[in-house]
Amino acid sequence: MSLPDPAELIRQMATDLNAHLSKRGISDPRFIGIRTGGVWVAQALLKALNNPAPLGTLDVSFYRDDFSQNGLHPQVRPSDLPFEIEGQHLVLIDDVLMSGRTVRAALNELFDYGRPASVTLVCLLDLDAGELPIRPNVVGATLSLAPDERIKLSGPEPLALELQDLSTAL
């Protein structure tokens, strides 16, 4: 399987996001990236939008519902939201949407900070493997993977996608 070029996806996502926000009458959203890949995608997206807005970052480790199964990520960092959440239009950015559990955790954390006016979900990739009813408003590409395959994003400069075969990693 050949993977798409993240730089090309980001350019298209910037166009699609502008159209989505314009259609909804949103002119000054707050941007939030989910660590770590979502922060990289958010940085690239803000650059493509030529938008100097501050970027908030979320570390959702303590909000995940699979915490007891997977344990704590070894490098938990605090979330950093340099703006109010209450009443704001938010653009929540993640790198890869798979089960939907990371986005659910991010939404739970955001609501602990306040009640946003709206949340627009932007993902570089949607793996169409959702376990929860969560879909991105703006997506770079939708891919279908075999059960033993995963996509890894490396970055931040340049962003690159790698297909990993878990069956050969054992």
Swiss-Prot record:
InterPro entries: PRibTrfase_dom (IPR000836), PRTase-like (IPR029057), PyrR (IPR023050), PyrR_bifunctional (IPR050137). It is an enzyme of class 2 (transferase). Keywords: Glycosyltransferase, Transcription, Transcription regulation, Transferase. It holds the Pfam family Pribosyltran. Its EC number is 2.4.2.9. It catalyses: UMP + diphosphate = 5-phospho-alpha-D-ribose 1-diphosphate + uracil. GO terms for biological process: regulation of DNA-templated transcription. GO terms for molecular function: uracil phosphoribosyltransferase activity. It comes from the Bacteria. A motif (PRPP-binding) lies at residues 90-102. Belongs to the purine/pyrimidine phosphoribosyltransferase family. PyrR subfamily. Regulates the transcription of the pyrimidine nucleotide (pyr) operon in response to exogenous pyrimidines. Also displays a weak uracil phosphoribosyltransferase activity which is not physiologically significant. NCBIfam families: PRK05205.1-1 (NF003545). This is Bifunctional protein PyrR. It comes from Pseudomonas savastanoi pv. phaseolicola (strain 1448A / Race 6) (Pseudomonas syringae pv. phaseolicola (strain 1448A / Race 6)).
